[in-house]
Design a protein with these regions (language model features):
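Local beta-strand N-terminus motif with an aromatic residue
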Residues: 4, 64-65
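Conserved class I S-adenosyl-L-methionine
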Residues: 4-13
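Short conserved loop adjoining the S-adenosyl-L-methionine
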Residues: 56-62
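S-adenosyl-L-methionine-dependent methyltransferase catalytic module, highlighting the catalytic core
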Residues: 77-91, 95-179
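Class I SAM-dependent methyltransferase SAM/SAH-binding core
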Residues: 13-56
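Hydrophobic adenine-recognition pocket in adenosine-nucleotide-binding enzymes
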Residues: 72
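A conserved beta-strand element that flanks and buttresses the S-adenosyl-L-methionine
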Residues: 68
């Protein structure tokens, strides 16, 4: 992850990503589900400067060196609004780091189908795919296309292979477009 003084984490959950960030001066989070922040460790809670329930609640003059969204973007309905707000808060030379499941690609589908899909069916006799349509409202292709409209993609890394349809997870580093 690129190092940064001022960081904003979108969808911080229980603050489990904090251990990967070093030497920052300010760490703000967006988390609409307050109970997730409540179960975070006291050590991590002390490192957080500001907590917001929504990106629109961040003061317009707040700028960040790095904005991160780990396993969050696939859940957001209005990506255009989110990316517009991120652009507002990302410093000119700042970095946006996004990690998403490679949903919609073959290996992701196969892995999901053979693990969660079967497990859910065996336990509940229900198709988890129906639930996933409401949980993950965007697949990887949609997300990558929207990112390209708002940001310059500097790097894409994938796990386990850096090949489309042979990946489970995608790590994207972006910067602002300079016109």
């Amino acid at each position: 992850y690129p190092k940064a003084d001022k960081i904003l984490e979108i969808g911080a959950g229980n603050l489990n990503h904090l251990k990967f960030e070093k030497n920052f001066k300010k760490y703000d989070v967006i988390e609409p589900k307050n109970y997730l922040l409540e179960i975070a460790s006291l050590k991590n809670k002390k490192k957080v400067n500001n907590k917001y329930a929504d990106i629109k609640l961040i003061p317009k003059n707040s700028k960040y060196d790095k904005i991160i969204a780990i396993a969050v973007i696939e859940h957001i309905e209005n990506l255009e609004l989110l990316f517009s707000e991120i652009n507002l808060h990302l410093k000119k030379e700042g970095k946006l780091v996004i990690e998403i499941p490679a949903e919609g690609e073959f290996l992701w589908w196969l892995g999901w189908r053979m693990t969660t899909g079967i497990g859910f069916w065996l336990k509940y006799k229900l198709d988890y795919g129906v639930i996933m349509k409401y949980e993950h409202v965007n697949n990887a292709k949609i997300i990558l296309n929207k990112i390209e409209k708002f940001f310059k993609i500097e790097k894409i890394k994938s796990f386990p292979l850096n090949i489309q349809h042979a990946r489970l997870y995608i790590h994207i580093v972006c910067s602002k477009k300079h016109y």
